[in-house]
Amino acid sequence: ADAIASDPMRSMEYPTAEEIAKAFSQEGLVGNLYKNYEPRAEQRDMSTSVRDAFASGDNLVVEAGTGVGKSMAYLVPLALTAQRNDITVGVATKTNALLDQLVFKEVPALAKALRVSDPDAKPLTCAPLKGFSHYPCLRKIRSVVDDGAAMKEIQGKELSQAPAMAALLSFIEQTEYDDIDGLKLDYRLLPRKVITTSSQECLRRKCPFFGN
């Protein structure tokens, strides 16, 4: 990304149509990812169209049915373009479930295949970004901790917030991803709104935890 920013007129290098076709062959980049992989013309054609849209700067709308392999069809030209030009590329997904699939399954598999095919290439990495309500707000959590664990009545039973608070604090201390969806908290005990913030509530640079 810095390379493009410092020289905005620098020409970009894109994978060729032949490289895309080879990637989706049985012996290619994608073919080596899956056992008993069968090349699909629809997947290859979609990937080529994505590559062409990158190169021309045009918009592209694709409609493809289930089983085509849409994610890998756009990830391959995206990854090759990002690697060769040392840039960051964003992918917006409709659901968080699809985002998690890309982050934890598709991209790591593709990154491994790229390392095998070209050990000297820059490693492919990714970072997920979700909405405010998916990440712990340290300012709000400090307030919850300062107030101490309270008792909550859940289905006629008095339950303490302490175990949920302990799990949350341990999660924050030990993880880098920090997406609380993976923690599976009982939000009846510890409501999401008291441990996360919103775009309206976030203090940004004025927050005492800014940069943490």
Q: Model features per residue range: what roles?
A:
Residues 38-39, 65-70, 200-207:
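Short, flexible loop segments at the rims of nucleotide/cofactor-binding pockets, characterized by
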Residues 2-33, 86-88, 92-212:
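A substrate-engagement module of RecA-like helicase motors
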Residues 39-42, 46, 70-71, 99, ...:
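Phosphate/oxyanion-binding active-site loops and adjacent basic polyanion-contact surfaces
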Residues 56-60, 84-90:
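Short, surface-exposed connector motifs at secondary-structure boundaries
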Residues 56-77:
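Walker A/P-loop
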Residues 51-52, 72-85, 105-109:
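Walker A/P-loop NTP-binding motif
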Residues 14-62:
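Conserved pre-motif I regulatory segment
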Residues 59-61, 81, 212:
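A compositional/structural signature marking long, glycine- and acidic/polar-rich segments
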